Amino acid sequence: MSKTLYQKLYDAHVVYSAPEETPLLYIDRHLVHEVTSPQAFDGLRAMGRKVRQPGKTFATMDHNVSTQTKDINASGEMARIQMQELIKNCEEFGVLLYDLNHPYQGIVHVIGPEQGMTLPGMTIVCGDSHTATHGAFGSLAFGIGTSEVEHVLATQTLKQGRAKTMKIEVTGDAAEGITAKDIVLAVIGKTGSAGGTGHVVEFCGKAIQALSMEGRMTLCNMAIEMGAKAGLVAPDDTTFDYLKGRQFAPTGSNWEQAVAYWRTLKSDDDAKFDTVVTLRAEDIAPQVTWGTNPGQVIAVNQTIPAPESFSDPGERASAEKALAYMDLKPGIKLTEVPIDKVFIGSCTNSRIEDLRAAAAIAKGRKVASGVQAIVVPGSGPVKAQAEAEGLDKIFIDAGFEWRLPGCSMCLAMNNDRLNPGERCASTSNRNFEGRQGRGGRTHLVSPAMAAAAAIAGHFADIRDIH
């Protein structure tokens, strides 16, 4: 019987199934950070349990960390307690920790692939909704809650029902300057922020195959923003070239065996999907969100829609509420809207290619007066590589702030946040009310678009910048 990639991955990991019961899946990798793990480790301690497979569990500090200093006290008492608890728990339970002073420390969804912890065919979980990022490698990766974190620590398994399947095919070639961020925002604009609910999404088509691994990670990172459980891209030579030689990747004959297996990880030609969505890459322009969910998005050269243009009453009400919160008027272009802050970073867009794209716009230019622009590399190795290439100097000369790795302004859990009423061009993944700080207004864009906004002082079409 023909199977989708998701069905192959799911079936390969079922360790127990019975009628009227949710199947039990084996978990190959468990990634842990300071925010969703303390209660899980406390639960193990209370029951006298150990971590069943500490060698398959990896931890880092990212959500709470300061991006201006390595001082554990810098982000406040709650952050300090959570980070100190993680240090204690990893020491006690034998889990490898990339702490504040580790050269490889960074955002959990950046360091996993970077170190080769993420490999095709795996099941990967983390107490974080953007775990879908790792699906770029053809692995089944999804976020879990704290009680599930405890269950995986204790058993290396998790009960998980079958999801529906969705194929998103992006045909043709994207225009120059159109990135994975623009593609995925255009997809979410078409499906809506709940269009993928109950599904695992597989991205395919010529435009997807043309993406680098970093682009594919951006794509899968935001699968959750259309309501999907996970996102997938079938592994290919681009995947294998990226992984070869990384710290936790197989070596020697094990590598050859692994690649031979990984090549089988693709949907069969006649596999049936529950839902199919198709977009033409050549129709996709640089995207900017205007509302308070990622589905409220337009091309940079389009006008903000009027609520009455939505036929669905729920969408109409949502648009009215979003426009009021964002303090925007329908019928205007976002290129007329001034900004206060720019954030280049997050598990969506903080890798070396993202920083290169932003630096190419920033080079020889200056951040507009009154705009604060920060660049936050996703990990220690990304920061080191960017500095070796001189990108930090380009940003600093242009008036951007060059920071230490961390989740930073993606979410208001550290010192990097918006003040009430401030408007931000952000390369992160969520533009919900208050996401970047109470009363803050978030517009999601690609790294190049964020850099262009910093220079112009308002949103700008990168296609007009030479």
Curated annotation (Swiss-Prot):
Domain of life per record: Bacteria
Molecular-function GO terms, alphabetical: 3-isopropylmalate dehydratase activity; 4 iron, 4 sulfur cluster binding; metal ion binding
UniProt keyword terms in alphabetical order: 4Fe-4S, Amino-acid biosynthesis, Branched-chain amino acid biosynthesis, Iron, Iron-sulfur, Leucine biosynthesis, Lyase, Metal-binding
UniProt-annotated binding residues for [4Fe-4S] cluster: C347, C407, C410
Catalysed reactions, semicolon-separated: (2R,3S)-3-isopropylmalate = (2S)-2-isopropylmalate
Family assignment from sequence similarity: Belongs to the aconitase/IPM isomerase family. LeuC type 1 subfamily.
Assembly and oligomerization: Heterodimer of LeuC and LeuD.
Descriptive protein name: 3-isopropylmalate dehydratase large subunit
